[in-house]
C-alpha cells in the first residue's frame, strides 16, 4: 500500500520524469517508452497546441487504440489546459459522429486514421504528431487542468440513442486516485507493473493508468488486435511481467480458457482488480484456484462517480458463503446511501437505489443539461448521483449489489442502454419494429443479448432462411452499432406484445427469455 497522497497529476508525472527519467512508463509489445520521453513528447505537443490558439479549456478528441501516443496526447492536453475525449478506433462510425455532434471539440488528434473526412475542426494526423514529438519543444506549465477543470470526458450509452459525455474534473480524479493508492482493499504496490487492456474510451482504463502514473509504475498495453486472437493473447500474456491485472471479469474468464494462466506460469502476478461489471462467485472461485495467493479485488461504481466508489478484497469465506459477492466498503470521502422511491434514506439491510455523493461525483453530462438535471442533484449539502442500481448496506458498512433498476445493463464490461440498441436495430431497412432483451445466467450476469424483431412486409420472401435474414441485418447495421451492442440471437415475430398503455412490453419479453 502506497501511503502517499498526490495533489496534482501532472506535477506527479513531471517529478517522476526528473527522478526516474529512464524508467519505463509504457511498454506496448516490447516497444518501451520512458518517463523522460513522456515528458519530452507531451511538452512538445503542449507547446504546439498553444500555438494553435484553441479556445481555452475546450475539449479535444483523441482517436486511437492502446498506442503510447494516446497517453502522450492525454498528458499534453492536460498540460495545455484542455479536457480530452478518448474515442476508440474500433468505434462505429455513427457513434463517432454522435460524439462529435455532442462534444463540439476544438481539435481531433488522430493517433489512428480518422474515418471522417471534411471535418469542421482541425485534425492532427499521426504523421504530424510524430514530427511534433521530434521537435523537442520546451514547455512552461502555467495553465494546466486543475481543480474543477474537466480532466477527461468519457462517453457512455444514452437512452435517446445519443451518447452521454461524463465530465470528470481534476478534483474528481484526485479523489479516486488517492483512495485507490491508499485503500487497504487494493493494497496497490509501489511502482505497479500494470496490465493496460481496457480501451481508453472505457473508464475502467482510469483504474490502470491513474494509480500507475501516481506511483511511478509501468503500463503494459495489450491492443485489441492481440485480445481478439486467442492464440496471440495467451502467448502475449505469459510473456508480460505484470504484477497487477485490471480488467472486467469477462476478460479474465477469457484468459482462464488457457490452462497456462496460473500462478506457476505467472508467479509475479499478485493483484487482480475488477470493475465494470459484476464479479461472480464462480469466476472468483476459479481464479482463486489458479492464483491461490493473489489478491482479488471486487470494485464497484458508475462512470459518473469516477470509476469506482467501493471495493474489497475477496476472502475465502465470501467464496464459500455468498451467492453474490459484496461490492465493497465505500470511499471515506464519498458518503453513499440507499434511498427509497421518495428519496428518503433507508435503514441498513433495506434495499433501494444506491446514491453516491462527495468529491468524486461528476459535474454532469457535457452539453446535456436535461439529462444532467435528471441524474445529478445535491444530497445533504454534497453533489450526488442517482446510480440507478439497487443495493443495500450492512451494519458493518458493506455495500451489497441488487442489480439494475432500469433497462440499462452491463455486458462484457460495457454499459448498454437497451433502448439505444432497440433504436439502432430499427434503423435497418429490413426491420419494422425491434427490441433488445438481455438473457441472464444463474449468476445474475448478462449472458447474451437477444433481439425480438418484426420484419417489414415482403422481407421474409427475399431470403431462404431466418439465418440469412439475420446476416443481412447485421451487415446492414455494421456501421451503426458497436460490436458489443449487436444481439447474438434474433427471434422473428409477427408482432410484439404491448403493455396496457400501448408500449412494447419489454419486461414481459425479459420474463419470457429468462424463465426457467
From Swiss-Prot:
Keyword Kinase in annotation: no
GO cellular component assignments: cytoplasm
Positions bound to ATP: 156-157, 298-303, 389, 401-404, 503
Catalysed reaction equations from the record: holo-[D-alanyl-carrier protein] + D-alanine + ATP = D-alanyl-[D-alanyl-carrier protein] + AMP + diphosphate
SUPFAM superfamilies xrefs: Acetyl-CoA synthetase-like (SSF56801)
GO MF assignments: ATP binding; D-alanine [D-alanyl carrier protein] ligase activity
Keywords recorded for this protein, A-Z: ATP-binding, Cytoplasm, Ligase, Nucleotide-binding
Matching Gene3D superfamilies: 3.30.300.30, N-terminal domain of ligase-like (3.40.50.12780)
Top-level division of the source organism's lineage: Bacteria
Signal sequence annotation: none
InterPro entries named in the record: AA_adenyl_dom, AMP-bd_C, AMP-bd_C_sf, AMP-binding_CS, AMP-dep_synth/lig_dom, ANL_N_sf, DltA, DltA-like
Family membership: Belongs to the ATP-dependent AMP-binding enzyme family. DltA subfamily.
Protein's UniProt name: D-alanine--D-alanyl carrier protein ligase
Source species: Streptococcus mutans serotype c (strain ATCC 700610 / UA159)
Amino acid at each position: 500500500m502506497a501511503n502517499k497522497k498526490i495533489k496534482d497529476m501532472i506535477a506527479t508525472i513531471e517529478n517522476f520524469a526528473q527522478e526516474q527519467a529512464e524508467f519505463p512508463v509504457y511498454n506496448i509489445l516490447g516497444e518501451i517508452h520512458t518517463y523522460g520521453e513522456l515528458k519530452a513528447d507531451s511538452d512538445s505537443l503542449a507547446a504546439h497546441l498553444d500555438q494553435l490558439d484553441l479556445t481555452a479549456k475546450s475539449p479535444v478528441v483523441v482517436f486511437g487504440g492502446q498506442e503510447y501516443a494516446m497517453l502522450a496526447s492525454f498528458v499534453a492536453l492536460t498540460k495545455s489546459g484542455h479536457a480530452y475525449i478518448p474515442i476508440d478506433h474500433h468505434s462505429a462510425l455513427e457513434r463517432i459522429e454522435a460524439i462529435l455532434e455532442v462534444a463540439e471539440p476544438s481539435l481531433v488528434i488522430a493517433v489512428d486514421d480518422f474515418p471522417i473526412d471534411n471535418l469542421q475542426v482541425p485534425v492532427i494526423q499521426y504523421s504530424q504528431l510524430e514530427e511534433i514529438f521530434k521537435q523537442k519543444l520546451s514547455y512552461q506549465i502555467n495553465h494546466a487542468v486543475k481543480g474543477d477543470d474537466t480532466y477527461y470526458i468519457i462517453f457512455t450509452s444514452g437512452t435517446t440513442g445519443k451518447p452521454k459525455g461524463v465530465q470528470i474534473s481534476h478534483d474528481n480524479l484526485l479523489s479516486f486516485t488517492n483512495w485507490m493508492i491508499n485503500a487497504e482493499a487494493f493494497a496497490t504496490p509501489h511502482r505497479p507493473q500494470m496490465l493496460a487492456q481496457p480501451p481508453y474510451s472505457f473508464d475502467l482504463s482510469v483504474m490502470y493508468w491513474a494509480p500507475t502514473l501516481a506511483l511511478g509504475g509501468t503500463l503494459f498495453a495489450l491492443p485489441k488486435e492481440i485480445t481478439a486472437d486467442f492464440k496471440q493473447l495467451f502467448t502475449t500474456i505469459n510473456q508480460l511481467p505484470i504484477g497487477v491485472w485490471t480488467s472486467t471479469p469477462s476478460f479474465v474468464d477469457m484468459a482462464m480458457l488457457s490452462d497456462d494462466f496460473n500462478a506457476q506460469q505467472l508467479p509475479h502476478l499478485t493483484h487482480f482488480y475488477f470493475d465494470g461489471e459484476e464479479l461472480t462467485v464462480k469466476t472468483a472461485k476459479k481464479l482463486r484456484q489458479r492464483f491461490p495467493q493473489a489478491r482479488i479485488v471486487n470494485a464497484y461504481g458508475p462512470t459518473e462517480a469516477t470509476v469506482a466508489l467501493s471495493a474489497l478484497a475477496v476472502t475465502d469465506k465470501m467464496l464459500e458463503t455468498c451467492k453474490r459477492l459484496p461490492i465493497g466498503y465505500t470511499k471515506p470521502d464519498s458518503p453513499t446511501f440507499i434511498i427509497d422511491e421518495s428519496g428518503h434514506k433507508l435503514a441498513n439491510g433495506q434495499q433501494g437505489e444506491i446514491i453516491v455523493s462527495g468529491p468524486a461525483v461528476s459535474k454532469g453530462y457535457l452539453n446535456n443539461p436535461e439529462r444532467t438535471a435528471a441524474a445529478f442533484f445535491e444530497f445533504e449539502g454534497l453533489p450526488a448521483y442517482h446510480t440507478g442500481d439497487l443495493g443495500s448496506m450492512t451494519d458493518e458498512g458493506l455495500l451489497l449489489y441488487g442489480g439494475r433498476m432500469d433497462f440499462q445493463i452491463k455486458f462484457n464490461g460495457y454499459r448498454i442502454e437497451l433502448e439505444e440498441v432497440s433504436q439502432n436495430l430499427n434503423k435497418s431497412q429490413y426491420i419494422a419494429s425491434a427490441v433488445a432483451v438481455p438473457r441472464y445466467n444463474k449468476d445474475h450476469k448478462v449472458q447474451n443479448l437477444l433481439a425480438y424483431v418484426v420484419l417489414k412486409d415482403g422481407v421474409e420472401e427475399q431470403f431462404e432462411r431466418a439465418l440469412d435474414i439475420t446476416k443481412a441485418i447485421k451487415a446492414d447495421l455494421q456501421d451503426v452499432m458497436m460490436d458489443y451492442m449487436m444481439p447474438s440471437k434474433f427471434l422473428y415475430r409477427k408482432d410484439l406484445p404491448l403493455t396496457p398503455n400501448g408500449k412494447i412490453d419489454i419486461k414481459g419479453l425479459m420474463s419470457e427469455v429468462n424463465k426457467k
